[in-house]
Amino acid sequence: ILDIPVIIEEQPFVEGKNLDVNQFYEKMANSEELLKTSQPNLADLDNFLMELGEKGYTHVIGLFLSSGISGFWANSQFLIEDHAKLKVAFPDTKITAAPMGAMVRNVLHWSEQGMSFENILKKLEEQVENTTAYILVDDLNHLVKGGRLSNGSAILGNLLSIKPILHFNAE
């Protein structure tokens, strides 16, 4: 629901507004620099929470990128007390990508089943603690662009067809 701008060669793009999926992958492949993201606008979240309260919602669960890779989760915590009409929870997902999407689907499913807010948060916490992800780095040049790997190591790794597998867990 909140836009996360992608910065490509110092120009901001937002998926679905001024960038589609095909353009994204093309720009990523052709970029000299690693693509960066900026945090969603905190004012947008504040406005969204106000709109939800005005529409009669009473409970809100927000799932954002892991606090380990984005400062948005920590910043979002300041808004919780500003919306006294809402019971708001922004748990740290400690993950991103597909596992976070699964969390969103599960929260929606549990809500549609009529599960209480507290039980949803408890089940979500269990899911967060038990979620791990493996990411295959198909192109070592992305690690070079991000400063995680030297050019020499990338050349050698590419010659040997090395594809690192990164493991993410709740820690």
Residue spans for each PLM region:
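N-terminal glycine-rich anion-binding loops that anchor highly charged ligand groups
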Residues: 1-3, 10-26
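Mixed-charge interfacial surface used for oligomerization/domain docking
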Residues: 1-11, 31-35, 50, 55, ...
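Phosphate/nucleotide-donor binding subsite
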Residues: 18-41
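A short, well-structured juxtamembrane/interface segment
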Residues: 40-52
